[in-house]
From Swiss-Prot:
Active-site feature positions: 53, 97
Keyword Lipid metabolism among UniProt keywords: yes
A GO cellular-component term linked to this record: extracellular region
A GO term, aspect molecular function: phosphoric diester hydrolase activity
UniProt xrefs under PROSITE patterns: PIPLC_X_DOMAIN (PS50007)
The name this protein goes by in its record: PI-PLC X domain-containing protein 1
Top-level taxon: Eukaryota
């Protein structure tokens, strides 16, 4: 074989290899966003999520709200995580249930590290955190917790100004820009100082929490006080409680019924009620014991799948 012929074959081989490599790259049509290609070109504000209420508080005790860890919740398919914060007796900013004496699930930075580690290995997923500020601390405490987790702030979405409902990016845009972590705080947010820590009630209203009626017969605006639903996303607290001498405990025994996709007292039934009032489906439905019932089916139904 002559040298020119050999060079010709090598050139053809390189061209073929390059063609194969290019064809193997994911195209815009190949992208799957939060598990569904249908979600990619929907705005964040147009999607409905089921969320894990009190996501860090895991176990079999009366005060626990979930049965599986935060990582397992994400693996299960949950993309909206809520949790409470307080400072414990040692002054550590922690994920604590009502008080750190009742339940201390570790530092806020440890919780954030768990989320960041999961995001690292799931590049096509958008996750939302709703973190409550139980002690009314300066928002810098939250920023300090994020700063303690190397690289997590690279994922955070920080709009340049407050977004109207129709101005939110699509999941595709969030994924392709790498801004796949949306963070809301329920009080003391200051987006002039920390633009990625979004004020929950500038974007959402909520229905009442600590419900004890297993049929969830209402969907009224509870917070913020005096708020109006127009132009806001909204969050439904679909968590059933038992009142034990004035202490509200999650009702683990009825979780299968509460978290059913359809039927009386189900996710679907309350979503239908809310939709009849606000003429749009909830953006978030918060749930205890997310492995009970059929919560992901309910989420798909809310999103028209």
């Amino acid at each position: 074989m002559s040298m020119s012929t050999l060079r010709h074959f090598l050139w053809l081989g390189a061209l073929l290899l390059a063609t194969i490599q290019v064809s193997a790259l994911p195209t815009a049509q190949d992208l799957i966003c939060n598990g569904h290609p249908e979600y990619c070109d929907r705005r964040y504000s147009e999607l409905s999520f089921v969320g894990a209420h009190n996501s860090p508080f895991v176990g079999p005790l009366l005060q626990h709200n979930q049965d599986i860890s935060v990582t397992e919740q994400l693996d299960f398919g949950i993309r909206f995580l809520q949790g409470q914060t307080h400072k414990n007796d040692d002054g550590v900013f922690s994920m604590c249930h009502t008080s750190c004496i009742l339940e201390d699930a570790g530092s806020v930075s440890s919780y954030l590290q768990t989320v960041k580690t999961w995001l690292d290995s799931h590049p096509n997923e958008v996750v939302t955190l709703l973190i409550t500020n139980g002690d009314g601390l300066d928002i810098k405490e939250f920023d300090d917790a994020f700063n303690a987790v190397n690289g997590i702030k690279d994922y955070t979405f920080a709009p340049k100004s407050k977004l109207a409902l129709g101005d939110w990016p699509t999941l595709r845009e969030l994924i392709t820009t790498g801004k796949r972590l949306i963070v809301f705080v329920d009080s003391k947010a200051d987006t002039n100082r920390f633009p990625y820590l979004l004020d929950e009630f500038s974007y959402y209203f909520e229905t009442p929490f600590s419900t004890t009626d297993e049929n969830f017969p209402q969907c009224k605006l509870d917070r913020p006080a005096g708020g109006k639903p127009d132009g806001q996303m909204y969050l439904v607290n679909h968590t059933l409680n038992v009142n034990v001498f004035g202490i509200f405990l999650p009702d683990r025994f009825k979780a299968g019924r509460t978290n059913a996709a359809v039927g009386q007292g189900s996710i679907g039934a309350q979503v239908d009620l809310c939709n009849s009032i606000y003429h749009r489906k909830p953006n978030v439905v918060l749930l205890d014991f997310i492995t009970e019932g059929d919560v992901l089916k309910a989420e798909r139904t809310m999103n028209g799948l």
